[in-house]
């Protein structure tokens, strides 16, 4: 599904004190510093053992090259989140039904529409509600025309779940993975 994005994507978005810029290889060093800053939080967020304690900057560069390619090919949106011009987080945006493997989709496809979009992300130094509210506001308006936005999280990210409740994102889709259950909120 390559037609889910507007023709022109913003190079910078400032909203609620957060700055979003495309996640590109040019940001490898500041992104790496943000990733290495709180490994336990990112493992809880990612739902696996990423990043490892010995996660090398070369692997981070490979990730950024892949994310940049995904954005260029219109497979996903990937933005760094900056606070005071420093990388402090990331968001990942893609069509909901394309973000899970076929095994997981059996439970999802009946409850989700083809145009539904899922957003997930992490941020240091600000409450989760700030990131989620900014993303839902920005991506829920022009130039985007998504039928529905879902925020993806899991039980390990209690701050994100609480933020979803506070923002009244109470429609819930759950997808059981190998080790945990992913929860989407709209």
Label the model's feature ranges.
Residues 1-125, 138, 142-186:
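GNAT-family acyltransferases
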Residues 126-131:
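Glycine-rich phosphate-binding loop
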Residues 134-135:
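Conserved A3 ("GATE") glycine/threonine-rich loop of ANL adenylate-forming enzymes
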